A protein has these predicted regions:
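Short beta-strand to alpha-helix junction loop
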Residues: 60-71, 95-105, 140-160, 169, ...
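Flavin-dependent oxidoreductases
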Residues: 18, 177-288
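Helical element adjacent to the flavin cofactor pocket in flavoenzyme catalytic cores
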Residues: 140-198, 202, 206-209, 384-395
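C-terminal catalytic lobe of FAD-dependent flavoproteins
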Residues: 299, 304-396
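Glycine-rich FAD pyrophosphate-binding loop
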Residues: 24-47
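Helix-loop-beta segment of a Rossmann-like dinucleotide-binding subdomain
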Residues: 4, 86-96, 108, 121-124, ...
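Beta1/beta-strand and adjacent pyrophosphate-binding region of the FAD-binding site
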Residues: 2-15, 33
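Dinucleotide-binding Rossmann-like beta1-alpha1 core, especially the glycine-rich loop
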Residues: 51-126, 136, 256-257, 278, ...
Length: 396
C-alpha cells in the first residue's frame, strides 16, 4: 500500500494520540494518520505508569515541564469532565524524614509556590491526620494532585480521532523516512508505505531512532530506565490512603519509590530506577544486546555512570533484593514489611542523555524541514499531554 496523507504521527501513546486529536480538530479537512508498531494502543510508557495527575511542584519555574504541566493539567481535567473519564483529585504528601530533607523540602515548597501550585508545609501531626501510617518530621501537602487511568484517556483520544476521520495503522514499524519529490515524505515499514507532507515523531522510547532516520539530532540518546513496582496486598491497603512521596534528590531526575493509590483502591509501591537492558526489557532476565550496546557505547553514558554510579548500584541492589526495596518503603511507611507486598508489572521510562552525560531535565521538542521531533518527554508528559500537543502543532 502507498496511501497519501497531510500529516503522519508516529507513536500510539498519549502524546501521539493527544496530538492526533487536537490536529484533527484544528485541520478538519486534512488527512491525518497515526502509525503504531504494536497491535494496540498504550503498550509501553502510557500503559505502564502509576497514573498520577501531577501538580507541577517539582519543576524549575519557567521550564517547559513547569509551564506544560500547569496548563496541561487544567486541560486534562476539563477533557475528562467533558468526556466522562473517571479521575480523582485526592492530594498527596511529600515527606521529609530528617533535618537534611527538611531543607530540601522547604526549597521544593518555594518552587511549588513559584509555579502556582496549591500546596502547604505541614507538621508531623497534620501529616498523620492525612496519612496516619506515614513517617515524616515535616511534609508538603499538595492538594491538587490526583489519580487517573491514562489508558482510558488515550482510548478516548483515539476514539475521537477516528470520529474526526483520522486513520490509525497498527503493526506499522517505521524503518525508513525519506524526503521525495514535490516536498513529500515517504514513511516505510516492511512492505508498507505511506506518503505525507509532515511527520510528527512521538515515538517515546524510540524517538531518538526515529529522529535519526530523518537526519535529526545525534547529540543525545534515549536511555531506558526500568521502574519496578510492588503492590500492597488488599489486607495492607489501609497503610496508604492516597499518595505518599519522599523528598526527591535534586541531583537525580527520578522521584524515588513512593506509594500511589489507584482508582480501584489498589496501592502501587515504587518505582525504582535501574538501567534497562533494552527499551522493552521489562523482565529481570530480558536482554536486548543491540539496544544495550547502543546505550553503553553512547559517549555520554560513561560520563553519566561516573556521576551516578553510587545511586546506580543502590538501585540495582534494590532491584534484586526485596528486603532492600522494602527498606526504602519503610522510610515512608515504617509498618510495612515484605509480607505486605506482591510483585507488580514494571515500566520503562524514556530519558534523554546528552553527550556530556547529563540527564536532560526538561521537555525538548524541535522541528526541521518536514518533521517535528519530540526528543524528550518524560514525566509529567502524560499530565501535560494536551499542552505538549499544542506546542507540537505550533511547530508544524
Amino acid at each position: 500500500m502507498k496511501d497519501e496523507f497531510d500529516y503522519c504521527i508516529i507513536g500510539g501513546g498519549i502524546v501521539g494520540f493527544s496530538t492526533a486529536y487536537l490536529l484533527s480538530q484544528k485541520f478538519p479537512k486534512s488527512k491525518i494518520i497515526l502509525l503504531e508498531k504494536e497491535s494496540n494502543i498504550c503498550k509501553h510508557q502510557t500503559g505502564r505508569n502509576s497514573g498520577v495527575i501531577h501538580s507541577g511542584i517539582y519543576y524549575k519555574p519557567g521550564s517547559q515541564k513547569a509551564l506544560n504541566c500547569r496548563s496541561g493539567k487544567k486541560s486534562l481535567e476539563k477533557f475528562c469532565l467533558d468526556n466522562d473519564i473517571n479521575f480523582e483529585i485526592c492530594g498527596k504528601v511529600i515527606v521529609a524524614t530528617n533535618h537534611q530533607e527538611t531543607l530540601r523540602l522547604q526549597a521544593l515548597y518555594e518552587r511549588g509556590v513559584s509555579n502556582g501550585v496549591e500546596c502547604e508545609l505541614i507538621s508531623k501531626s497534620r501529616l498523620l491526620e492525612i496519612e496516619p501510617h506515614a513517617n515524616g518530621v515535616e511534609a508538603i501537602h499538595v492538594k491538587e494532585c490526583g489519580i487517573i487511568n491514562y489508558t482510558d484517556v488515550c482510548q478516548k483520544f483515539s476514539d475521537l480521532f477516528r470520529q474526526l476521520n483520522g486513520s490509525i495503522y497498527f503493526n506499522f514499524l517505521v524503518k525508513k523516512i525519506k524526503k521525495i519529490k514535490n516536498n513529500k515524505v515517504l514513511v516505510s515499514s516492511d512492505g508498507n508505505h505511506i506518503i505525507c507532507n509532515k511527520v510528527i515523531n512521538c515515538a517515546g522510547l524510540y524517538s531518538d531512532d526515529i529522529a535519526r532516520l530523518s537526519g535529526g539530532k545525534k547529540n543525545f540518546k534515549i536511555i531506558p530506565f526500568k521502574g519496578e513496582y510492588f503492590k500492597l496486598k488488599k489486607t495492607s491497603q489501609h497503610l496508604c490512603k492516597n499518595l505518599i512521596y519522599p523528598t526527591p534528590n535534586p541531583q537525580f531526575p527520578f522521584l524515588g519509590v513512593h506509594f500511589t493509590r489507584g482508582l480501584d483502591g489498589s496501592v502501587e509501591c515504587g518505582p525504582n530506577a535501574v538501567l534497562a537492558f533494552g527499551k522493552e526489557a521489562y523482565g529481570k532476565l530480558d536482554f536486548n544486546l543491540a539496544e544495550t550496546f547502543s546505550s553503553i557505547t553512547f559517549p555520554g553514558f560513561l560520563k553519566m555512570a561516573s556521576k551516578h554510579w553510587r545511586m546506580g548500584l543502590e538501585e540495582m541492589y534494590r532491584s534484586y533484593n526485596k528486603k532492600a526495596f522494602v527498606k526504602a518503603l519503610k522510610r515512608l511507611v515504617p509498618e510495612i514489611s515484605s509480607r505486605d507486598i506482591t510483585p507488580f508489572p514494571s515500566g520503562i521510562r524514556a530519558q534523554a542523555l546528552d553527550l556530556s552525560g547529563n540527564l536532560i531535565d526538561d521537555f525538548v521538542i524541535d522541528s526541521s524541514d518536514y518533521i517535528v521531533n519530540v526528543y524528550n518527554a518524560p514525566s509529567p508528559a502524560a499530565t501535560s499531554c494536551l499542552s505538549i500537543a499544542k506546542t507540537i502543532i505550533s511547530k508544524i
